[in-house]
Amino acid sequence: MIYVVMFIRIAKQKRGNKLYRHLQIAESFRDPAKGNAPRTRILAHLGTVEGLGEEQIEKLIAGLQRAIGVTPESLPHLLSARDYGHIHAVGGAWDQLDLSTVLNDAGVRGDASFDAAALIRMLVVNRICDPCSKLALLDWLESVCYEETGRPSYHHLLRAMDRLLLVKETAEPLLARKLVAGSEKLDLVFYDITSTYFEGDRSLSEDDFRRYGYSRDGRFDKRQIVIGLVMTREGIPLCHHIFPGNTVDKTTVGRVIEDIESRFALDRVVFVGDRGMLSDDNLDLLLGKELGFIVAYPLRRNSFSREVISGLRKEFDRKNDSEQFHEGVRAEMRFVVAYSPAIAREVKAARAERLGKADAWIKEVRRKLAKPSGRGRVPTPQGTYDRVRDYLRDHHLLGYYNVELNSNKLSVTKNRAALAWEDTIDGMLMVGTTDMESRMEDIVLRYKELAEIERGWRSLKSTLLLRPVFHWTEKRIRAHVFICVLALQLERWMRRKLQGIASVPRAVEILRRIKIGELEVGGKRTHIPTAATVEQKELLKALGVRPIPASLSENRM
């Protein structure tokens, strides 16, 4: 059998200093007379590429196409290519949980003439995929393929936010039941607060809830609000609360406890938080309501912690590398002290390094005070004293040194008592609890799970861009925070599905590479996705989202 393949060939020939490219029509075949060896023969010489020119070559191509009935109009034209895969995945996760129905059950639609739940879905998908302002979202829709609804008006987006805020009290318990259904037992809730600040002073009134207060972002020069978040042990938010920016942490706990009791059908609940937030009054409130708690006690500048640890310190085997636990009971309160030799060594080494750098810096500063170089400003004892204190304070080392200035003489010595106590508590954690039955290891583990809420704050502030806030009225600010918390809820649900495969931000970036191309063929338009890779298919399968469709109809775009 003879196999023949025809093709265009460019043969190069050099004559003197010139290179000629000859355009030929050739065919390759296998010659049976030569043992089916491959051969090439020239069917036609069309001239040189330089002699024909670009225009003649294009006419030649067009003529060959006409010979088989192909016209420029019948060729496919790619009109646009927009991001799609991440939109499909995040929107599919929302749909799998049927969150639009949950919001409608809560009454989000009301008497609105538009589908408020669909617009909230859009806002949440945008917050996870490409967070931006509500106004910028309209431009974002031009760069992605969002198939579930048409282009909304900015006015309708804001009204959808208003509708969401109106049903917050009803919607949060319904959303919580949907998000945690069958996945975990709700006997443990974590509570923590953070703050977010605002740029500028627009529209501020005397009773505005944006106030100056303790800033977790270190921006004490900015007005802020305080946000309290109640989470499950898997890091899924149950509800959130917003307080004026000058609210003290521990004053929020009572209101949150009352809210959890009234809105969430929780049986035996253990409240987990930091001791600074759970004041004695708050602990009494929890005990009075027969709610349990697990709290961590500060190990420095706390006489009670010092008393408990001093009584248990001899129980720990410092030569044993395994994690150790010891406990005690006082006034119907159980105290568990955990000790990790590995963490102790790590903390001790890090502190020694910081102290070594500080000692070297202090030595150099004191040398310059004793023997000025004669250049620049001459150091003074008071100025050097201030510099040393500022350096130690900024490096969180001031408590380890005694810095004194007496009769213009600077004295810097180590605080041996403070360092000895640091050596004692390195690698230790002390928690108090009402749980008298669980193993010590489980008590400590439950408290450590509080770190999950810290990761939640980081997601809100970085990945989901809680800040900057492009709203200036209280109700819109509250609605914006609710949208961000909804996005965090969905992101945490997706994270659980993707565990061991990829993080949610990584999955979003991988799936973003799936594009939807808008093709025009013969005057008709169609929307075709790029082929999904094995990795992309695995991510969609893990999320339980339907595969990418072969094409999208015009009315869904």
Region roles according to the model:
Residues 1-3, 7-12, 17-22, 27-36, ...:
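Anion-binding and metal-coordination hotspots
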Residues 1-80:
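Nucleic acid-processing catalytic cores of prokaryotic defense/repair systems
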